[in-house]
Swiss-Prot record:
Annotated Pfam families: Glycos_transf_1
NCBIfam families: PRK15490.1
Record GO biological process: capsule polysaccharide biosynthetic process; carbohydrate derivative metabolic process
Database matches in InterPro entries: Glyco_trans_1
Gene assigned in the entry: vipC
Name under which the protein is recorded: Vi polysaccharide biosynthesis protein VipC/TviE
MF GO annotations: glycosyltransferase activity
Metabolic or biological pathway, per its Swiss-Prot or TrEMBL entry: Glycan metabolism; Vi-antigen biosynthesis; Capsule biogenesis; capsule polysaccharide biosynthesis
Source species of the chain: Salmonella typhi
């Protein structure tokens, strides 16, 4: 006969399998079916709490632990304390475990001692008591970084450009991924050619360190391109050997701090420190907040002398869906470490980060994107046929207004549909072209149909022929709520199309106001009347010109060429921060 313990063990294995298969809802349903709360022994309730916690049903698990603790179940105290500690609630765990019965306290003394050590250390470093409910993993991360506040980075190469690694989360199809790939390719070419960048001879290969390149998640969009250019690529997710051993850390205090970090920091340290030590990097440039959280402390432990933190969009305190409580203490601590500074691709983002983190402007540098003029030749006959069919349906149109964006909330696609409807009221001889795909595309098309303008809008979908579609437009419009530095505004001008944009991110830095485009008043609520007025002006401006004006051409050449981007990047990272 199968015992209760054996049944519970089998259920635990099944739940683990379902979790690995990402079938969490199915796992929860199974747990509730097999272990109905009203008929549980103490052992079964304890195991149910464990299983629920393991499938991310944290609140329900904690409620069960508290029910058992109310019944003076010391094993529940221990299990609850252990899980609280591992999630960063060391003070909560300490309070719970201190209350175990005197008769069994010895059983849990080692674990309580471990909790007491980290709490005592953190309170000493903070100079104050830490209240219950505080995430102690974040405090430990902060002080692990501050351990290096008096470090003396080794001297950087003089007269040559040393060994560089560029790090980010993936090589998907995003703008940051395009820029980091382009940068790696250009430096790799100079290395093969034994050339110079900004007067510095490139004597070392460049490496891309990427968290994950899973094809099924489309995280490898630029991988083929960088490999063809002989860029070395390391995928962190595939590192299985030569992992970090904290026994190599001499300071007992630092070792204790490293034992109580946020999981993503632990992951970066475990997988990357040995590799970074082996590579003996001179410079490390880490792009995007999530990668900075994973890699920055690992780089300090490995002794990388020059660390640059790449900020590609507005801070997570503005883009709430990207917010993590680790970011603010992470960046504020890193800002005081010698050899570390911040880099962005526009001044708007640096101002927002500086205001949020209460840091001086000297901590930030700007490297504008390097943008290649888009090809206006289609990659196949398909775009041309689509365009011909659309022009046949809209033969009365003498003006084409368009946009290129993902159909997601941040890009505000419904404002685009509303603009088209408003503009058509006074300019019926207008057609519209929208390039891009996303979760809200079908809803945007439905909105256009409801407004009676679906026949006037060509929804191209995702396309590699962006240049072809841009050169069909008389005016380009971007209604984004949030941006970093939108390359598409630059690309539109490169093919001679004037632009209108919200002031999202660095959009206003992409063109000359009143010459090659206009900025709207507000990024969150689009002023459609203002957008219509600007569109009228630019349509007339476009008709009076033949191509891009010299002033705009010079502006784009001086700010957004790939050569300028690479040169500025090397200049910023090849010297120690001020």
């Amino acid at each position: 006969m199968i015992t209760q313990e054996e049944k519970l063990a089998a259920l635990g294995k099944t739940c683990l399998t379902l979790k690995q298969e990402k079938k969490l809802a199915q796992a929860v349903a199974l747990i509730d079916s097999e272990l109905p709360t009203e008929a549980l022994t103490s052992l079964a309730m304890l195991k149910k709490a464990e299983f629920l916690h393991d499938v991310n049903e944290t609140e329900r698990a904690y409620a069960l632990y508290e029910t058992l603790i109310a019944q003076n179940n010391d094993e529940a105290r221990y299990e609850y304390a252990r899980r609280l500690y591992n999630t960063g609630l060391a003070k909560d765990a300490q309070l719970i475990l201190k209350k175990v019965s005197n008769g069994v306290q010895k059983k849990y003394n080692n674990y309580l001692g471990k909790i007491n050590k980290i709490c005592d250390l953190l309170e000493r470093l903070e100079g104050k008591a830490i209240p219950v409910g505080t995430n102690t993993c974040i405090i430990a991360m902060k002080h692990a970084i501050l351990f290096y506040r008096n470090r003396q980075p080794r001297q950087l190469p003089v007269g040559s450009f040393g060994r560089l690694a560029l790090c980010t989360g993936s090589l998907g199809s995003g703008g940051a991924e395009r820029q980091i790939s382009r940068l790696a390719i250009e430096i790799a070419r100079k290395y093969r050619q034994k050339g110079k960048i900004g007067g510095l001879k490139v004597e070392e290969p460049v490496e891309l360190i990427i968290r994950s390149l899973t094809p099924e998640l489309r995280q490898d969009f630029f991988l083929k391109e960088v490999l063809e250019e002989q860029v070395e690529v390391l995928e962190i997710a595939k590192i299985t050997g030569n992992l970090f051993d904290d026994a190599t850390i001499e300071s007992p205090e630092l070792r204790l701090l490293l034992s109580h970090l946020p999981p993503v920091c632990k992951y970066g340290i475990k997988h990357l420190v040995p590799h970074l030590c082996e590579r003996k990097l001179d410079y490390l440039s880490v792009w995007q907040d999530s990668a900075c959280l994973m890699i920055a402390l690992a780089a300090l432990i490995a002794g990388v002398p020059r660390i640059q933190l790449g900020l590609r969009g507005l801070p997570p305190v503005v883009r709430k869906r990207l917010f993590k409580p680790e970011y603010e203490p992470l960046y504020q601590a890193l800002a005081v470490v010698p050899g570390v500074d911040f880099m962005s691709n526009n001044h708007c983002v640096t101002r927002h980060y500086a205001d949020w983190l209460k840091l001086e402007a000297k901590h930030f540098q700007v490297v504008y994107n390097g943008v290649l003029p888009p090809s206006t030749e289609p990659s196949s006959e398909v775009p041309h046929k689509i365009w011909q069919q659309f022009t046949q349906k809209t033969q009365d149109a003498d003006t084409t207004i368009g946009g290129v964006f993902r159909f997601v909330g941040d890009k505000n696609p419904f404002a685009w549909i509303d603009f088209a409807a408003r503009y058509l009221q006074h300019h019926p001889a207008t057609r519209f072209v929208l390039v891009g795909d996303g979760d809200l595309r079908a809803e945007a098309q439905k909105r256009a149909e409801q407004l009676g303008i679906l026949e006037r809008i060509l929804f191209v979908g995702a396309s590699r022929d962006v240049g072809y579609w841009l050169q069909k437009m008389n005016v380009f419009i971007l209604f984004s709520r949030y941006e970093g530095l939108p390359n598409v505004l630059i690309e539109a001008q490169m093919v001679g199309v004037p632009v209108i944009s919200t002031p999202a991110g660095g959009s206003a830095e992409c063109f000359i106001e009143g010459v090659s485009g206009f900025i709207l008043d507000d990024a969150q609520t689009v002023n459609l009347d203002q957008a219509c007025r600007y569109a009228e002006k630019l349509v007339n401006l476009w008709r009076s010109r033949t191509g891009i004006c010299q002033q705009t051409q010079s502006f784009l050449q001086e700010r957004f060429t790939v050569e300028h981007m690479v040169g500025t990047f090397v200049k910023t990272i090849a010297s120690q921060p001020r």
